[in-house]
Amino acid sequence: DWWQEQLADVPPLLELPTDFARPAERRFRGAWIWRSLDGEASARLRQFAGSRQATLYMLLLAAFDLLLQRYSGRDDIVVGTPVSARPQVEFEGLVGLFVNTLVLRTDLGGAPDFDRLLSRVRATATAAFAHQDAAFERLVERLQPGRSLARAPVFQVMFNLVPMPAEPLEAGAVSFRPGRLLDHGVSTFDLTLTVGEQ
């Protein structure tokens, strides 16, 4: 199957430099750091991505993969990304949040220039999203990756691009204003990059 081929011999750990040794068991402690881009910079990034037949998501993921390669010294970069899991018509009328996790594995070997890297990321992301019906939990069961209490299986880094409405959402007498996510001091992964797009 496509996922088994894509994730064959996936490295068990993306070792990032930290100021402390990895504990024997994950503690799930973490924090959020907020940064924002102005509208002009965002527009230039979208334009750059479009000029290379890519999306903003693909462009930012390629840049993130490159950063992870530089910090880890590895060419095989494995990142998770959440996706809305409502591909089946039967789920459309149900209330609730259905989320699946896709694994995006990018080969940065051969020192590709950024255009070539973006092309690789585009191909990987397009294929992964085309195969998003496979539940991540089932993939882990089938792949049987080496398990450890010290890390998440398959990937330890998450990437997410979230659409953030610029205007309040109105629902009758209730108004929802976009804002920052709450920092609960918890992290499921070693590193998560969430980009809010307005």
Model-found features: residue ranges?
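Adenylate-forming
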Residues: 4-9, 17-23, 30-198
